[in-house]
Swiss-Prot record:
Main location: secreted
GO cellular component: extracellular region
Organism domain of life: Eukaryota
Propeptide residue span(s): 25-107
Annotated signal sequence range: 1-24
Organism of this sequence: Aquarana catesbeiana
Name of the protein in its database record: C-type natriuretic peptide 1
Function noted in UniProt: Hormone which plays a role in endochondral ossification through regulation of cartilaginous growth plate chondrocytes proliferation and differentiation. May also be vasoactive and natriuretic. May be important for freshwater adaptation.
GO biological process: blood vessel diameter maintenance; cGMP biosynthetic process; growth plate cartilage chondrocyte differentiation; growth plate cartilage chondrocyte proliferation; receptor guanylyl cyclase signaling pathway
Annotated keywords: Cleavage on pair of basic residues, Disulfide bond, Hormone, Secreted, Signal, Vasoactive
Pfam families, per database record: ANP
Subcellular localization(s) per the UniProt record: Secreted
Length: 129
């Protein structure tokens, strides 16, 4: 009995000692954290230099006319008219949207090998799957 108790206590002490040696130093200040971030990302997070290096978006639009076209297209796509139209289509055809999901089962679509529902193997092409 004492042998088991001694082994258990020895194992616990070994765990405590190994845990004490493997712990790292805690980062206690914000400076240590910011230094760690700067080392990892090679950029200073607290400086204004990063803001000055950014190119304004207006100059990009002047350089490339396709960027201007994409920006205009995205702005037009976010109009409420498009969203209302999509909502209206969904409300007008609730049966059509649910019809797609009726034919599904747990394993997916109930279709054969090539997208056609088969009654038996090889009925469509004579070759099977």
């Amino acid at each position: 009995m004492s042998y088991k108790r001694g082994t258990c206590l020895g194992f616990i002490m070994l765990l405590m000692v190994s845990h004490h040696h493997t712990k790292g130093k805690p980062l206690s200040s914000l400076q240590n954290l910011s230094r760690l971030l700067e080392d990892n990302f090679e950029r200073s997070f607290g400086s204004d230099e990063a803001d000055q290096q950014l190119v304004p978006t207006d100059s990009l639009d002047q350089l490339d006319p396709e960027l201007q076209w994409n920006k205009n297209r995205l702005e037009q796509g976010d109009s409420p008219h498009v969203n209302e139209m999509t909502l209206q289509q969904l409300l007008n055809d609730p049966v059509g949207t649910s019809r797609r999901y009726r034919q599904r089962n747990k394993k997916g679509y109930s279709r054969g090998c090539f997208g056609v529902k088969l009654d038996r193997i090889g009925a469509f092409s004579g070759l099977g799957c």
